[in-house]
Amino acid sequence: EATSNFVVGDITVSGGALSDFAAASSTVYTATFTPTADGAATIDVAPSTFTDASGNNNTAATQFNWTYDGTAPTMTITATDGSNAVSDGSTTNDATLTVTFTSSEATSNFVVGDITVSGGALNSFSATSSTVYTATFTPSASGATTIDVAANTFTDAAGNNNTAATQFNWTYDVTVPTISSVSLASDNS
């Protein structure tokens, strides 16, 4: 019903604040809700806060509830050579690495194409959960390799784009050491 005394103060909110309250008509009102942080938010109108033209008090509104998520997901890249961890920036002679990509939030659209590599190739990419993905990295030759996930390549359930992962750097070294010269300091014969 039409009302003329419904005001922004009749609305109770948690988890944010209302602004730009306006009457679009005598029965429709609009406002902008801005969350203060990630988490639960509610908007409510209690009973008997405004009246209709005949002076009848309103009944309680159905509370509007939802959870706000404005945090961008992050991705952590780690590697192992079987059961041993391989540190970022290290040098090894492992023919393959198992690379694990761990998202801070569940995602359903992280795919192998979101990953960039240099010095090798990824295969056997699979999801072990909605936050953990694995792949096998095979270097193409001795030398520096990188594995990276750029910003804005996947989203969380709320639609937030990811931040860039810290690049994983590893050097593959299968060069056999050689001795270039041998000299004797003295001859005892």
Where does each model-flagged region fall?
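Non-catalytic beta-sheet/beta-sandwich ligand-binding modules that flank or precede catalytic cores
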Residues: 1-189
